[in-house]
Amino acid sequence: MAEPPGDPKAVKQDDNGKYLDAKGAPTFSVKPDGTVDWYTYSGFRRYHSECHVCHGPDGEGSTYAPALKDSVKQMNYAEFYGIVVGGKQDLGSGETKVMPALGDNKNVMCYIDDIYVYLRARSDDAIGRGRPAKHEDKPPQATAAEQACLGDKS
């Protein structure tokens, strides 16, 4: 098992407006009034578009897939990324649980940081269940990165 993620506190913002922790991993920012950063909000949207069918609403888990809000407490960004890209198979207690490889799914991979920071915010209880009520505006850099990743020429 890889090194745990460490303190999720944001210590800096990169050129794309993403928040990073002391180890340089993507993390969330929640203001005292509950306003979340754009990427955490985007992660909520992307998680509920691509991940919640198996892993349950709000990262809470289901009968056949773990609660990711709990998993990311023990999983650093590199480990999370590797599992999402390559998949994972658990053989234990008479059950086979399979996480499919999603490395070719642009609807996941173009937003992998966003999904991770959303789950980190949920795991730290920085945000509750449901859609965040307030969020920062979408940075222009997020739009440019999205268009480049998805192949949109507009």
Residue ranges and their predicted role:
Residues 6-46, 153:
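Electrostatic cytochrome c docking/interface patches
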Residues 47-57, 80, 84, 99, ...:
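The canonical Cys-X-X-Cys-His
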Residues 47-50, 106, 145:
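Secretory pathway export signals and precursors
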Residues 57-60, 130, 154:
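Secreted/processed peptides and extracellular or luminal domains of membrane proteins
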Residues 36, 40, 44, 73, ...:
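Solvent-exposed, acidic/flexible segments
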Residues 41-52, 61, 74-81, 132-134:
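Sequence context surrounding c-type heme c attachment/ligation sites in exported
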Residues 3-9, 62-69, 87-115, 119-140:
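Axial heme c-ligation environment in periplasmic c-type cytochrome domains
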